[in-house]
């Protein structure tokens, strides 16, 4: 039994897709366990970029199984579009498996997402308006429609009618909006279900059988720990659990079958949307990092907020997600800076704290306490060994590891697969 979970340790966009793609080379099954098409991940193969939102990164390996787990919420329209995109690019999808227990995002979820966000006014949480939150709301309220329901024409229509009756009351009476007619969406979405039917199965059986047979299984998280609904910067979070513990619920695999947790982070920090960000930069350095790092959302295209590396955030992520190994990405983005900073603690009302507060009011008053390190001017995008990094860059990498308290297994100096360098093989140490 060999299994590895890949989680983002910041607010998403840490390069999980790249690391998952890298680790997938030695895995036999790759599975996603939470989130939906609000999470974009970019894979670069031979200089060509592929952008995915639902399908696991392992789809580019035709000999491996890629799984959309039961903890995900699936927009069938987006999924069919993504499948068609892959087919047009010459990528086979015969190895895809979709959980029959995953919940379905429908047009009324997206409309409700939009209306709820608009109603918040200045208190918006920065949702991607993909219907993720409302779909998880229906799941928790036990009125959600699952993939298994979508495939049965009569059951799908019955449950769609029931849900539309409730949602339309909200649209018309609470939001003064237009009702959605069942005939406008039923046939379209039933047809999407028929197009994905060949991939649908009980994925928990596939995953557990693979682990019992000693196969290598890689679990791919979306978003990041700081967007986790329980452990993140609530309420500026997603509606699911990106932490490693989400694997057990979102894939149907017991916790005793998880061996290692790889935490993925950038050498700086970024965030899309609203919410606390203690190390955020508003100066020319921040603008430079954003441009050099191409910090624009894969899903939304929005400019990301950027800031210095925050070891307080990272230690929180390490603790709540049980991180055993670290993948440090985008070190090259910091090249050319005279000084680089790492947040080592916060100053809260004159008191030094080393943990991440739950209170948003306290977070607003937190001031980062920085440790400054000398920067480096060299182009490091061609570096393939740690010892070949400039001394100051090596010192930065080592200091990150010391402050987080986790050994670094890989470091990256660019977006391409061959720019990811191994310090310790995650698979061979199992």
Curated annotation (Swiss-Prot):
Active-site feature positions: 13, 41
Pathway: Purine metabolism; AMP biosynthesis via de novo pathway; AMP from IMP: step 1/2
Listed Pfam families: Adenylsucc_synt
Binding site for GTP: 12-18, 40-42, 304, 330-332, 412-414
Binding site for IMP: 13-16, 38-41, 128, 142, 223, 238, 302
GO terms classed as biological process: 'de novo' AMP biosynthetic process; IMP metabolic process
Cofactor note as given: Binds 1 Mg(2+) ion per subunit.
UniProt EC number: 6.3.4.4
Binding site for substrate: 298-304
UniProt-annotated location(s): Cytoplasm
Enzyme class label: ligase
Disulfide bonds: none
GO CC field: cytoplasm
PROSITE patterns given in the database record: ADENYLOSUCCIN_SYN_1 (PS01266), ADENYLOSUCCIN_SYN_2 (PS00513)
Lineage top rank: taxon: Bacteria
Function: Plays an important role in the de novo pathway of purine nucleotide biosynthesis. Catalyzes the first committed step in the biosynthesis of AMP from IMP.
Family classification: Belongs to the adenylosuccinate synthetase family.
NCBIfam families to which the protein is assigned, alphabetical: PRK01117.1, purA
Subunit organization: Homodimer.
Protein name: Adenylosuccinate synthetase
Native source organism of the sequence: Streptococcus gordonii (strain Challis / ATCC 35105 / BCRC 15272 / CH1 / DL1 / V288)
Gene expressing this chain: purA
């Amino acid at each position: 039994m060999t299994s590895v979970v890949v989680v983002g340790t910041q607010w998403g966009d840490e390069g999980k897709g790249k690391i998952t793609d890298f680790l997938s080379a030695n895995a036999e099954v790759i599975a996603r366990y939470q989130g939906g098409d609000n999470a974009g991940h970019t894979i670069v193969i031979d200089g060509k970029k592929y952008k995915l939102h639902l399908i696991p990164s392992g789809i580019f390996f035709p000999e491996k199984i890629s799984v959309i787990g039961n903890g995900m919420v699936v927009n069938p329209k987006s999924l069919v579009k993504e499948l068609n995109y892959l087919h047009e690019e010459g990528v086979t999808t015969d190895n895809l498996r979709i959980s029959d227990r995953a919940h379905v995002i429908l047009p009324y979820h997206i409309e409700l997402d939009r209306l709820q966000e608009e109603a918040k006014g200045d208190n918006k949480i920065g949702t991607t308006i993909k219907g993720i939150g409302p779909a998880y709301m229906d799941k928790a309220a036990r009125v959600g429609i699952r993939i298994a329901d979508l495939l049965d024409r009569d059951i799908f229509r019955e449950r769609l009618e029931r849900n539309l009756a409730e949602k339309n009351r909200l649209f018309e009476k609470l939001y003064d909006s237009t009702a959605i007619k069942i005939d406008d969406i039923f046939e379209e979405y039933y047809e999407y279900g028929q197009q994905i039917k060949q991939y649908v199965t009980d994925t928990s059986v596939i995953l557990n059988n693979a682990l019992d047979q000693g196969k290598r299984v890689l679990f791919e998280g979306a978003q990041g720990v700081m967007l986790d609904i329980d452990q993140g910067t609530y309420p500026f979070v997603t509606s699911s659990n990106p932490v490693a513990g989400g694997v057990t619920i979102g894939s149907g695999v017991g916790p005793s079958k998880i061996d290692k947790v790889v935490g993925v982070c950038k050498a700086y920090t970024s965030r899309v949307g609203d919410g606390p960000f203690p190390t955020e930069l508003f100066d020319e350095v921040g603008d430079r990092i954003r441009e050099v790092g191409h910090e624009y959302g894969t899903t939304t295209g929005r400019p990301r907020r950027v800031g210095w590396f925050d070891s307080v955030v990272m230690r929180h992520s390490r603790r709540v997600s049980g991180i055993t190994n670290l993948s440090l990405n985008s070190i090259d983005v910091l090249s050319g800076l005279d000084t680089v900073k790492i947040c080592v603690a916060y100053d809260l009302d004159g008191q030094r704290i080393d943990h991440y507060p739950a209170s948003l009011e306290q977070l607003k008053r937190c001031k980062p306490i920085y440790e400054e390190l000398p920067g480096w001017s060299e182009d490091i995008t061609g570096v393939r060994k740690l010892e070949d990094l400039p001394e100051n860059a090596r010192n930065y990498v080592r200091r990150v590891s010391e402050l987080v308290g986790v050994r670094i297994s890989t470091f990256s100096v660019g977006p391409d697969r061959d720019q990811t360098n191994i310090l310790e093989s995650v698979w061979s140490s199992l």
